[in-house]
Amino acid sequence: MFSINPLENLKLYISSRPPLVVFMISVSAMAIAFLTLGYFFKIKEIKSPEMAEDWNTFLLRFNDLDLCVSENETLKHLSNDTTTPESTMTIGQTRSSTQPPQSLEESGPINISVAITLTLDPLKPFGGYSRNVTHLYSTILGHQIGLSGREAHEEINITFTLPAAWNADDCALHGHCEQVVFTACMTLTAAPGVFPVTVQPPHCVPDTYSNATLWYKIFTTARDANTKYAQDYNPFWCYKGAIGKVYHALNPKLTVIVPDDDRSLINLHLMHTSYFLFVMVITMFCYAVIKGRPSKLRQSNPEFCPEKVALADA
């Protein structure tokens, strides 16, 4: 009568076919990996690989800039009714425009204002300003923040609107100027091609951002990371000045993620692949339980021949 001993057959199968056992284990591990990856895509938001740059990565580029506010710079008075030049479009005008995208390149530079953290770290000789400094402005080129291609040569005007006046009152109070941290309104003025085309950060309004009654702005020189670590680095680059640093905190809402439909499709493909691999492993396992040890085992010695052994015995 035909009988099957599953455990004995499985032991014989494992001992007689080690490579196939290793293959089964590898396929099982791959199936588990695909299953885990599919579940990960289902529950997690994944950054889209098709979008090379979003506003998070763009604003992080400014973290590498050093801004020098020199004590010798001339203050320029601003009136509260200062308006944006006619040659510059605000981002609101750009959004409401019905022009096709290709005409934006001919419309001139645009303004985009975002809130950002600005740290001003005065050096010891710096004595501060007697006037209320509310605006810092600078001009850089695209390559200074790591842009490439045509955008590397584009000019970017940066204006920081401080929420409160920055003057020498605190310097006189403490005997020296201390580091100050502002949540400033940074206005970037550049060609439309410089900016990412993804979801934009919340905007601030420079004209109503500062509570000072008298406005003064001062020019700052910018230095990128490549210049800072170059061999001809000047240690007295910002002597008798204050070094400004920009800090952007990552905003998850600005990251472009893979759409839900695409994530579901990826999850479905990974699940189908893992199921197929599991079926393959289960099939081989059932075969091992039923078949057991093979009927004929090949000898490890290639010179072994049963016919020759029989003739020798005769």
Swiss-Prot record:
Residues 80-105 have a biased composition (Polar residues). It is found in: Membrane. Keywords: Membrane, Transmembrane, Transmembrane helix. It comes from Rattus norvegicus (Rat). The gene is Tmem248. The chain crosses the membrane at residues 21-41, 179-199, 270-290. It is a multi-pass membrane protein. Belongs to the TMEM248 family. GO terms for cellular component: membrane. Residues 78-106 are annotated as: Disordered. This is Transmembrane protein 248. Its main location: membrane. PANTHER family: TRANSMEMBRANE PROTEIN 248 (PTHR16002:SF5), TRANSMEMBRANE PROTEIN 248-LIKE (PTHR16002). Pfam families: TMEM219.
